[in-house]
A protein has these predicted regions:
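Glycine- and Gly-Pro-enriched alpha-helical subdomains that act as flexible
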Residues: 273-321, 339
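N-terminal extracellular/periplasmic Venus flytrap/periplasmic-binding protein-like
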Residues: 11-13, 24-33, 44, 152, ...
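Conserved catalytic cysteine-centered active-site region
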Residues: 57-112, 152, 167-170, 234-260, ...
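Conserved active-site "lid/cap" helical segment
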Residues: 1-72, 76, 175-187, 204, ...
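Flexible glycine-/small-residue-enriched beta->alpha junction loops
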Residues: 111-178
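Beta-strand segments within the central parallel beta-sheet cores of soluble alpha/beta enzyme folds
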Residues: 47-56, 84-88, 112-116, 189-196, ...
Length: 371
């Protein structure tokens, strides 16, 4: 059976939404630059040999609509290249890599582009979830329950225990507060993780790590952007601990222990081991196994627990076999909750910082973590 390997990656700098370095970039243009950058690193690969361009996007509407994956392919001059846009929200471009992995394992292709993009700055031009009056009234009671707990709550339990529907439209900040209540993870622990993320990112920047990882972006006016907007040098617990809760008056989630809103794109070239050998390419990594899981949407941040268990099970491995872990830092509480339940050594986790410092463009993040 063929193996799936990663032979090239590219990721843009990450901009702050609405006020950062990439506000002028359309999502299709930004994604096209990163796909081009990833392909430029493997000139032996003829674009006509690519089987599909799979692009993850958390809000595939507005400027990111019209099957943006196909738009990107055509923009690059690859009218012959199919494209599919995938929405699994914050893990969209992990899912596209998973799809490439599965296609290669099934023998249905030997070279794929897995990409991801999100430009929150461009959301005023339209989003897939932005239409008014589109919520299913079946969930009205659940939404009212969420609105009530946003004013303050002392605990969380699964509404299914009361034969009630969970809130599928719940804001992510509310889910983070629920995770904090459910796990008992303190504000101090969350703040210290947020500081760690910033400090680790600062160390990685100073060592040149991100300079090697980032592919510069050329803006419409010709300006070149090559660094992330988010990392804050000299972040301390004393500073972070003074911030006020964002989502609940009695909450623990703040701007210092959660990710900001962002713009960014990334791309990964995945191919079979035989194709890489044929082209004389040295793989950067081999994809061994993947896993997905579901749980109450009201505590969505603990999803990595069962997903990691599944992937390790398929790979016939254990947590102790893994040298480095990446869990997306949408919120510190979800990283800590997942890592502690899995028994992950924090010294192996998000070693160069994570989304709290770097940023979290939803559809991009999976490919950024991979890169």
């Amino acid at each position: 059976m063929p193996e799936a390997v990663i032979v090239s990656t590219a990721r843009s700098p990450i901009g702050r939404a609405g006020k950062g370095s990439l506000v002028s970039m359309r999502p299709d243009d930004l994604a096209a630059q990163m796909v081009r950058a990833a392909l430029d690193k493997v000139p032996a690969l003829d674009p006509r040999e690519i089987d599909d361009l799979m692009l993850g996007c958390g809000q595939p509407g507005g400027e990111a609509g019209f099957n943006i994956a196909r738009v990107v392919a055509v923009e690059l001059g690859y009218d012959f290249l199919p494209g599919v846009t995938v929405n699994r929200y914050c893990s969209s471009s992990l899912q596209t890599t998973r799809m490439a992995f599965h296609a290669i394992k099934a023998g249905e292709g030997s070279a794929f582009i897995s990409a991801g993009v999100e430009t929150v700055s461009r959301f005023p031009m339209g989003t897939s979830d932005g239409w008014p009056d589109s919520h299913n009234p079946l969930f009205a009671e659940a939404e009212a329950r969420t609105a009530a707990t946003a004013g303050g709550a002392g605990s969380w339990h699964d509404p299914r225990e009361d034969d009630l529907l969970p809130d599928v439209y719940i804001a992510m900040g509310q889910t983070a507060e629920n995770v904090a209540l459910y796990t008992g993870i303190s504000r101090e622990d969350q703040d210290r993780w947020g500081v760690r993320s910033q400090n680790r990112a600062e160390e990685a920047i100073n060592s040149g790590f991100f300079a090697r990882e980032i592919s510069p972006v050329t803006l419409p006016d010709g300006t070149v952007v090559s660094t992330d907007d988010g990392p804050r040098a000299g972040t301390t617990y004393e500073k972070i601990s003074q911030l006020q809760p964002v989502f609940r008056p009695d909450g623990t989630v703040t701007a210092g222990n959660a990710c900001p809103l962002n713009d960014g794109a990334a791309a990964v070239v995945v191919m079979s081991d035989a194709k890489a050998q044929e082209l004389g390419l040295t793989p950067l990594a081999r994809i061994v196994a993947t896993g997905v899981s579901g749980l109450s949407p009201e505590i969505m941040g603990l999803g990595p627990i069962e997903a990691v268990k599944k992937a390790l099970g398929y790979a016939k491995m254990s947590v102790s076999d893994i040298d480095l872990f990446e869990i997306n830092e949408a919120f510190a509480v979800q990283v800590l909750g997942s890592a502690r339940e899995l028994g992950i050594d924090e010294d192996k986790l998000n070693v160069s910082g994570g989304a709290i410092a770097l940023g979290h463009p939803f559809g991009m993040t999976g490919a950024r973590i991979t890169a």
